[in-house]
Amino acid sequence: MSTENTLSVADLARENVRNLVPYQSARRLGGNGDVWLNANEFPTAVEFQLTQQTLNRYPECQPKAVIENYAQYAGVKPEQVLVSRGADEGIELVIRAFCEPGKDAILYCPPTYGMYSVSAETIGVERRTVPALENWQLDLQGISDNLDGTKVVFVCSPNNPTGQLINPQDLRTLLELTRGKAIVVADEAYIEFCPQATLTGWLVEYPHLVILRTLSKAFALAGLRCGFTLANEEVINLLLKVIAPYPLSTPVADIAAQALCPQGINAMRDRVAQTVQERQYLVNALKQTACVEHVFDSETNYILARFTASSSVFKSLWDQGIILRDQNKQPSLSGCLRITVGTRQENQRVIDALRAEPV
């Protein structure tokens, strides 16, 4: 029998896909909890009624109501907005549009969101890392030293999982360093919790700036899978060349348009205020908990904390049905767990469980 007939299906796959370690999403990690504080979701559901029932027809590639509503909300032109299946698809689209596999590289600054790396590896694009400084700000010299051959630089602000904003002057320096050389992607998935820090006002000045947004966090629609890419029209037109022909289903577009109407935006801002209040409650309580070494400042809907024995704490709470996010494997985050801000009842369960931990 020939070797060709004995190859497994896996042998037929691309080598980089065979070697790929997929992104460990909260759902992929599993668990049997009833307090889910590991995915930075809003803790309660928002109800919507479908108004579009014409499901026998394909949807628009870029639903007009969604684009126009988001443009008005974000303070940009409709031509500067692209909607996709979550911001994760936006990450992939930028890499596919701007990076030649085997030639170009992306650059990111760990500890940060894992999908930048996974998306590049899936496509076969080199990944370069310039670890953040001790205060988790950008190592601008390190980035500058690695720009040759880099086509896309990813920066998350506020950063996931650390929760802090990137210094705006450093972002401006980065944009000057990369002008004419690379695209800079600012991931603003959590910007609703600190809207004053958005870079949307910089799009005119920096044609190579791309901003990622989502409805998964403050809009409480993680299950909808709806994200946005904001950029200059030239960039948006390039991304439209590589996006799928029907990225958003009719029900998704229907609900997204409703969420982005004035009433929906006001409701989102109420949720943000509620989350910020609960975040402060949780921070204060964690600082008075014996097994907690340090609580890091956060501008988001989650808190990063360092524990005296994070692995045993994580497992203990897991066994009690309280699911947190272990960050031990991230660079510089040894001993750290990330806790999504939940309801007052959920937050109290976390505190009660932590205070029962042996020290």
From Swiss-Prot:
EC number: 2.6.1.9
Cofactor: pyridoxal 5'-phosphate
Gene Ontology biological process terms from the UniProt entry: L-histidine biosynthetic process
InterPro entries tied to this protein: Aminotrans_II_pyridoxalP_BS (IPR001917), Aminotransferase_I/II_large (IPR004839), HisP_aminotrans (IPR005861), PyrdxlP-dep_Trfase (IPR015424), PyrdxlP-dep_Trfase_major (IPR015421), PyrdxlP-dep_Trfase_small (IPR015422)
Modified residues (N6-(pyridoxal phosphate)lysine): K217
Keywords: Amino-acid biosynthesis, Aminotransferase, Histidine biosynthesis, Pyridoxal phosphate, Transferase
Transmembrane segments: none
Domain of life: Bacteria
Catalytic activity annotation: L-histidinol phosphate + 2-oxoglutarate = 3-(imidazol-4-yl)-2-oxopropyl phosphate + L-glutamate
Metabolic or biological pathway: Amino-acid biosynthesis; L-histidine biosynthesis; L-histidine from 5-phospho-alpha-D-ribose 1-diphosphate: step 7/9
GO MF terms, alphabetically ordered: histidinol-phosphate transaminase activity; pyridoxal phosphate binding
Enzyme class, broadest EC rank: transferase
Family listed: Belongs to the class-II pyridoxal-phosphate-dependent aminotransferase family. Histidinol-phosphate aminotransferase subfamily.
Protein name per its UniProtKB record: Histidinol-phosphate aminotransferase
Source organism phylogeny: Bacteria, Pseudomonadati, Pseudomonadota, Gammaproteobacteria, Enterobacterales
Protein's gene: hisC
